[in-house]
A protein has these predicted regions:
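Extended, hydrophilic extramembrane loops/domains of integral membrane proteins
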Residues: 81, 87-124
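Short, charged beta-turn/beta-strand-edge "cap" motif at the junction between a beta-strand
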Residues: 54-58, 71-74
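Short coil-to-beta-strand transition motifs
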Residues: 6, 69-78, 106-108
Length: 158
């Protein structure tokens, strides 16, 4: 049974759009995938967040920010609980909504990546792990099949 090559275009286009959409739609912003439960129930693992650049002066209590912890924890998204001056510099005290205590460090302007602009629930699952590999496989299989059909058609025309 020969597959209709037009049917192969549909999953190819969908897979490419799903992989490219976040980067095009939110160009200029930083896209991150939540991997922990520290911000439950607001942010769940596999949620995608869009982070816009911000400075500490723009932050308010209650904002969710992304920052580099410069420790083994890497990039973190937590809620601002206080913005204040310490030793002549503005700093931010943060806490995960699902954590009992505030973070044991202060976020400086150098650490700050930005403020969370939007949350896309569960969408991160298509950009990480097995689903991403499945989408890449769909793209490769569709492309190879379409090239094979194209070559076969061109040979039969000669």
């Amino acid at each position: 049974m020969k597959l209709d090559k037009n049917l192969l275009i549909i999953p190819l286009v969908v897979a490419v759009l799903v992989l490219i959409f976040p980067f095009v739609a939110f160009s200029g912003d930083t896209i991150m995938i939540i991997t922990t439960t520290s911000m439950l129930p607001v942010l769940n693992p596999n949620d995608m967040i869009v982070v816009e650049s911000a400075s500490i002066d723009e932050l308010r209590e209650g904002d969710i920010i992304a920052f580099d912890s410069h420790q083994k924890m890497g990039i973190i998204a937590h809620r601002v609980i206080e913005v204040f001056e310490k030793d002549g510099d503005m700093v931010v005290d943060t806490k995960g909504d699902n954590n009992e205590k505030p973070d044991p460090w202060y976020v400086t302007d150098d650490d700050l990546i930005g403020k969370v602009k939007s949350i896309i629930p569960v969408f991160g699952i298509v950009l990480v792990g097995p689903v991403r590999f499945a989408l890449v496989a769909v793209i490769i299989i569709s492309a190879v099949s379409m090239m094979k059909d194209y070559i076969t058609e061109n040979r039969s025309k000669k």
